[in-house]
Amino acid sequence: MKTSLETLKGLSRSLTIDLPIDIFNQKMDKILQKMALEVNIDGFRKGKVPISIVRKRFGNNANSDVINEIVNETLTDALAQVKLTPVAQPVITKVDSNSNKNFSYTVEFEVFPKIKIADFSELSIEQTKVNITKADEQKTLDGLKDRLTEYKAVQCKSKMGDRLSIDFKGLINGETFDGGEAKDFKIVLGKGSMIKGFEEGLIDVAYSSRVVLDLTFPKDYYMDKLASKDVTFEININEIASPKELKLDETFAKKFGEKNMNALRVSMKEQMRVEVDGRIGHLNKNAIFDKLTTANPFNVPQHSIDNEAQNLFKAMQDRMQHQGLSTQGEMPITAFNDEAQRRVKLGLLVNQISRDYKLSVSMKQIDEKLKEISKTYGENAQQMIDFYNQDPTRKSSIELLVVEKMVQDLILDKAQVTFKQKKFQEITQ
């Protein structure tokens, strides 16, 4: 067997395998002889059909069978001869069985890139830290209180903390705009849910009154087309309701599944820490891996990108269907190519680092990671753990997370790391 390798664009390769024609002919004769014993052709007794007739009638089908058989028997050895591992099953692009001496076929495929990891010590990485303050805890407790607060309609003028039911219409240059009006809209004064000046302008107003506010959208408003625009809001006050007194006592705590306020505060702080750690972990992980991918440029197999894009597309469809949304008119698969390329590249980098540093994961590490993740599932934590324990193959995704964390720690140990302090609200909003 002779092999001839050609490098195509990027990671694509073309491999031609030459074999003695006798191999092809012998296999062809064997198949035709077997067919001659089995086929029924008018004018001939079964088992007595001449090979020449069988070749003429069924030669094309037999030819395909022989080619597939030869490829299956020889391709693995041919790839080993050129020391290449394809990303996916090679595709046959050319077959030549007409020569008197040789039978040849050509396959094309992609190979994995050769990756030499850049020196971690040359990476400058910023990591985020968050301290949870007493004020953060109080604000979170206030949020729990808001969830249970009941309101009672009153006839007096509005004050901070009241809930108003309003109709409003926003006008820019005398014209309405998308999202600029609503009926029976509920707003609690002082919560900062509207642009600056809106809630302030509704303090000390009477029931059934009409208020006109001239305001300006902030320059960093999330809708670019409205940013920095002057706007006039015409507002009708339909109802003013004051909050009923709500005591932070044992009854309050039990509504959140705790026996008393001390237990509720402890549980609340634990959940705050879990939430912050999860968000910071994601933020810091991205910061590390973004630097890693930037410092290690290389071509990524297109086949792997296409597969990952398909997975992302399918995941989006599943989420939409689960939420009862229509999948008609959704974005094309190609819209996921950039994210797919990032994920594939990162996966190749993590695998290479894992091999370079001979990283291994124990079952204890996997179980500890599983327990850590389960904390985000609240009362369903044990159910989540049981799901993974029922089928050991499900733990492969947890194992990958452990390896990724080991790689992160390796990089941080050697890189130039700076820390940025952020507030609890910045991370959780």
Curated annotation (Swiss-Prot):
Enzyme class (EC, first level): isomerase
InterPro entries in UniProt: PPIase_dom_sf (IPR046357), PPIase_FKBP_dom (IPR001179), Trig_fac (IPR005215), Trigger_fac_C (IPR008880), Trigger_fac_C_sf (IPR037041), Trigger_fac_ribosome-bd_bac (IPR008881), Trigger_fac_ribosome-bd_sf (IPR036611), Trigger_fact/SurA_dom_sf (IPR027304)
Subcellular locations according to the entry: Cytoplasm
Residue span(s) of domain PPIase FKBP-type: 161-246
EC numbers, comma separated: 5.2.1.8
Catalytic activity from the UniProt record: [protein]-peptidylproline (omega=180) = [protein]-peptidylproline (omega=0)
Any one annotated GO CC term: cytoplasm
Pfam assignment, any one: Trigger_N
Gene Ontology biological process terms from the UniProt entry: 'de novo' cotranslational protein folding; cell division; chaperone-mediated protein folding; protein transport; protein unfolding
Any coiled-coil regions, as ranges: none
Keyword presence, Chaperone: yes
GO function term, MF aspect, one: peptidyl-prolyl cis-trans isomerase activity
Keywords assigned: Cell cycle, Cell division, Chaperone, Cytoplasm, Isomerase, Rotamase
SUPFAM superfamilies from the UniProt entry: FKBP-like, Triger factor/SurA peptide-binding domain-like, Trigger factor ribosome-binding domain
Protein task: Involved in protein export. Acts as a chaperone by maintaining the newly synthesized protein in an open conformation. Functions as a peptidyl-prolyl cis-trans isomerase.
Family: Belongs to the FKBP-type PPIase family. Tig subfamily.
NCBIfam families with a match to the protein in the record: tig
Comment, domains: Consists of 3 domains; the N-terminus binds the ribosome, the middle domain has PPIase activity, while the C-terminus has intrinsic chaperone activity on its own.
Protein's recorded name: Trigger factor
Species per Swiss-Prot/TrEMBL record: Vesicomyosocius okutanii subsp. Calyptogena okutanii (strain HA)
